[in-house]
Each structure stands twice: as C-alpha cells, then as structure tokens.
Amino acid sequence: MQNAHRSRRILGAWLFTSALLLVGCSEKAPDGSDAGTDDRPRVALIMKSLANEFFISMADGARAHQAANPERYSLVVNGIKNESDLAQQVALMEQMMATGVDVIVIAPADSKALLPVARRAVQQDIVVVNIDNQFDRQLLAEMDIAIPFVGPDNRDGARRVGERLAAELEPGDEVAIIGGIPGAFNARERAAGFTDAMQAADITVVSTQAADWEQSKAASIASALLREYPQLDALLCANDSMALGAMAAVRQAGRSGEVRIVGFDNIGAANALVQSGELVATADQHADRLAVYGIEYALEILETGQIPTDRTTPVDVISGES
C-alpha cells in the first residue's frame, strides 16, 4: 500500500496545492515547502457544517496537530455550508480524490449517501477513516469495503446525559426528543440513548422529532411542542445547536426554569449555560481531538498497512456537578 501511495504523489502534488486555493472552505498550504518535492502523506479532513461551533473546534484541533507535526503530513481542511448539503460533501470528496490525497478523514453528513464516493476512494488506495457520524455498517458489508469508525459511543453518551436529566424529573413526567438528520447514524443513536434513559426512569417520551441539527429548526419544533404539550417537563436535544434553539423557544414561551433542556457536544455557548444552570447537561466528545484521533489512526494504517478496525473515543457528561 505504501508504494502505491508514493507513486501517486508526483502526479497529484500540484493538484493538491491548487485545491488548497480553490476549495471554498479549505485550509491554506500548511508550510512553504515545494509541493513537487514534498513526500509527506497528504491528508484531507472533510467535515459537516462549519457554521457549527463543534466542527470549527474540530478543524482548529486538526490544524494545531498538523502545525505541531509539520514533518509528518500536510493537511487540507474542508467543510460544507449546512448540515444537510450532501451534494457539496460528495463534491469535496471527489475533488480531494482528484488531487491524489493519501488520506481522507470524513465526518459524513449522512450514513449512507456518502458511501459510494467513499468506496471509490478506497478503490483508489486512499485511506479513508470515518469520524463523528458512523457509516452504515450493513451497507459497508454489502459493498465489501473496510472503513474504520473512530469516534464515541453516541448511544451511551446520550443515555448518560439522559440519566443526568432524569435525576431532576419524576416518574410520569413528560419529555420530548429533538433529533438530528434521520439518515445520520449518530442522530439515531443519540435519540435511542435518550429513550433508554427515559424508559429506565419511567418518564414518558411524548414526541421525537428531527430538526436536522439546525438551531432555527429546533426553535420552531420546540415552540410547537410547548403548545401541543403544555405539561412538557423537558427537551432532550441531540446536539447543542438544537439545545440553544430549544432554549430560545422556552424563553419566548415564558417557561424558563420550568422546562429543562439537555444537549450534546459541549460547544462553548452550551458549556456556559451548563455552568449558569440554564442547561442541565451536555456531552463532551472532545471536538478538538476527534479529527486528530482519525488522522493519527489513518497515518498508522498508511505506515503499517494494517487491516483497519473501529476505535472508540472518549465522551464525558458535562453538568453543573462535573
């Protein structure tokens, strides 16, 4: 595998340098070296929405890691404009493949829709590592490709956040879940984890709705839920952006302090609300390290040729008690 990667570098180097300038949301060249003589592995990080603070932290962490290890690899960072722009993410994958990168670390917007282009990358001997949102395992098996997932156990993390919320509720209380994109594995796992915790505490989930990870959609959904279920005691949101939207709706309804809210991701704004007591809890999956975990593992695969396997990364519950 290593020889195949080296053989592509001369052909792809100038294309990679051009891509650093042409991709709309991408990293500039990490150093002043001549791309034509640069024998370092070329790594592309492709994320979801760069409007989300979580992915900004992920990108910053990756850049800092590359800056601390400039001799090990070069890096280009890409993101899409919104969480559901699958076509743009596919286009970014294809563009990075055309430049002859050695590694693609991807946080896919959808667990199935990105797999065909990911398979083409693997067939080109590009090391592909999946982070954040897990690719569909059944479809991977049907395609007969090995793409490792490096990331947290989303169901367990959401369950533990839900348990923290349940400690403030009573059996029979009513809650609703505001989830992410239905086609995303991590969205389904977080909703399942929230449900696990509520069922264990004999708390009633009156509704589960998708806000596609978006703050404004979550605000609209939360407003409707508050009207439909006037006895609603809590909202469990599958990411912090949606938790912020839900909180805005609760404030507008004049129910601050009555309707409890939890999130997931531990972005800065949410962490501040946890510390002030306005948000019960969130989950920290360490955005600034998540891409780094993926990059490190991809470089290990590239160097050793080992068969890739999944790796679980930390997730911690953040509450006023932590």
Regions found by a protein language model. Give the residues of each.
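Extracytoplasmic "Venus flytrap"
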Residues: 42-61, 65, 69, 76-90, ...
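Hinge/cleft segment of the Venus flytrap/periplasmic-binding protein
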Residues: 12, 25-27, 32-39, 178, ...
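Short, low-complexity disordered leader/linker segments with a strong preference
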Residues: 1-42, 119-124
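Hydrophobic alpha-helical
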Residues: 106-123, 194, 206-207, 211-272
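Hydrophobic alpha-helical segments within soluble ligand-binding/sensing domains
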Residues: 43, 89, 149-175, 217-218, ...
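Short, solvent-exposed amphipathic alpha-helices that sit
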Residues: 54-69, 157-161, 185-204, 217, ...
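Short beta-strand elements in bilobed, periplasmic/extracellular small-molecule ligand-binding domains
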Residues: 68-82, 174-177, 195-215
